[in-house]
Amino acid sequence: QHVIANSSEQEFDYPKGEENVYISYPGKGGVEISNFWRKFLFGWKFDGTSLLLSGYPTKESRVMFHRNIRERVGTLAPFLKLDNDPYIVLAENKLYWIVDAYTASEDFPYSQRFRASQITRQRGDFDPVFSRHKLSYLEGSNYIRNSVKAVVDAFNGSVDLYVFDPEDPLLKAWSSVFPGLFKPREQMPDALEKHIRYPADLLLTQGLVYSKYHMTDPGVFYNQEDLWIRATEKYYGQVQPVEPYYIMWEPPDAQNAEFVLILPFTPKNRQV
């Protein structure tokens, strides 16, 4: 849904005593409605004659669209698979959204395709909604790399795509097709890089595959003697698989606690 910012109608900001404080958007996000033809074309695209006939927009007004974080990044780089869990961070006194982006393929040689529903059904890992993470966007892939971190400025909407796996061949190909679209990791501000985390969707995908392919003995693998399934827990009286979760954890002999992502498994048919 589009919005018109910096119109003649000011926005409510906060109450102050018996009065209200109003504000107009002072940023550079969106596209200026600086003349009749822009106003006409945006009105044609978004809401017919309402924008054209309204007296609220001014020459300083801006129309904002593609405001959903995943939609915004996906419009710029539709060839990337985007994580379901964008997260907001505070860095340098500003708010930013960070989205994990993946390069993926269904045609990697000698690699089994990821079939989430099939994996859970075959192993008795019941999960009727297949977790809150909804891995359907990775379904069928047999090559997945978390090669890019997308950063969206929450104030002006600018998007930066930082490369976190420069050796990824798919990303190399896309970088050559769209020079200048990606920035090296070294250009990411330190304040932002401190907020980078391992994505839960990726760990869940890797964990479901690893629950079978951790077996290295050919005989054990052939007979499927050591299959794992996700650990279970009771939640409001219902038994459900444990979702990946972040914790602060201090490893043995470590000086400081670390922010880690955990996904527990148990041997099949041996869970309590």
Predicted regions and their residues:
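Soluble extracytoplasmic regions of secretory-pathway and membrane proteins
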Residues: Q1-V272
